[in-house]
């Protein structure tokens, strides 16, 4: 049935929302003049620095650009497992 809906041009709400979110991210990147490669590099460096002081959960890590009040904001959600002791740093 899903195949038939796609064939007739009826997308599932999930794929529509995914496409909308992808377009939103592309527009934000364009407005901020930051390429996806630069954002990935920034994410890697943030993880590298924070990992010196904290044990983080890489799987739950999210770094994105968001449009807030006519400005672009870098938003990082970094789950912390535990703090490293001073002796471990």
Curated annotation (Swiss-Prot):
One biological process term in Gene Ontology: regulation of division septum assembly
Organism, scientific name: Desulforudis audaxviator (strain MP104C)
Protein name: Cell division topological specificity factor
NCBIfam families, per the entry: minE (TIGR01215)
Manganese as UniProt keyword: no
Functional description taken from the UniProt entry: Prevents the cell division inhibition by proteins MinC and MinD at internal division sites while permitting inhibition at polar sites. This ensures cell division at the proper site by restricting the formation of a division septum at the midpoint of the long axis of the cell.
Top-level division of the source organism's lineage: Bacteria
Family: Belongs to the MinE family.
Keywords assigned: Cell cycle, Cell division
Originating gene: minE
């Amino acid at each position: 049935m899903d195949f038939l809906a796609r064939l007739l041009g009826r997308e599932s709400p999930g794929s529509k929302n995914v496409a909308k979110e992808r377009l939103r991210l592309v527009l934000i990147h364009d407005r901020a003049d930051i390429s996806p490669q630069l954002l990935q590099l920034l994410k890697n460096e943030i993880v590298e620095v924070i990992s010196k002081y904290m044990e983080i959960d890489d799987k739950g890590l999210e770094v994105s650009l968001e449009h807030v009040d006519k400005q672009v904001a870098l938003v990082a959600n970094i789950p912390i497992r535990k703090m490293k002791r001073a002796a471990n740093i």
